[in-house]
């Protein structure tokens, strides 16, 4: 696949950033990505206004100060989710990730020849699949990035961490994953 020059430059920057941040502990990296989230909140006005509008619609009883606080926390969380995707392999080893109901999930996966669908929303759930990669192949649904190079890097890093990417709205890929023999 041919990438645009801008996609290549962004890819090189992200790889460089990953290498530099690898020198820091996971705890510090999470704080750094929270900062990236807050930076995005302030720099991307269109997204910020959309986020605030959505929160106002969801919580009409909240005042502007509370709405802004919720919006900023949302951006911090998104920053941490991006960090988790980039460093998934490290996040899921050496006891860094605790999976609630892991025994139940393992039983469902081990005692079933059919596909097992685990729905976790944005509760940090895709790390669980990565932790249990020795049982079967796990997939997580992700929205494709506009930058194809970044999208390919994120997919590669997730796979290295034991998690396979399923593009959002790709029915054929979903059907193929569901019908795959474990």
Could you describe each region identified by the protein language model?
Residues 114-169:
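Catalytic core of membrane glycerolipid acyltransferases/transacylases, capturing the structured
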């Amino acid at each position: 696949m041919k990438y645009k020059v801008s996609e290549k430059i962004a890819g090189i920057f992200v790889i460089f950033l990953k290498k530099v941040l690898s020198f820091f502990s996971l705890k510090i990296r999470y704080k750094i990505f929270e900062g990236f989230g807050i930076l995005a909140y302030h720099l991307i006005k269109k997204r910020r206004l959309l986020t605030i509008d959505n929160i106002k619609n969801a919580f009409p009883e909240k005042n502007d100060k509370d709405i802004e606080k919720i919006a900023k926390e949302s951006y911090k969380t998104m920053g941490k989710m991006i960090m988790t995707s980039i460093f998934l392999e490290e996040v899921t080893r050496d006891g860094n990730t605790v999976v609630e109901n892991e025994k139940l999930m393992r039983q469902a996966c081990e005692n079933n020849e059919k596909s097992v669908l685990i729905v976790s929303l944005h509760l940090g759930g895709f790390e669980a699949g990565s932790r249990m990669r020795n049982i079967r192949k796990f997939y997580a649904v992700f929205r494709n990035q506009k930058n194809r190079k970044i999208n390919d890097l994120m997919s590669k890093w997730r796979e290295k961490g034991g998690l396979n990417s399923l593009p959002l709205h790709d029915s054929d890929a979903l059907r193929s994953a569901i019908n795959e023999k474990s």
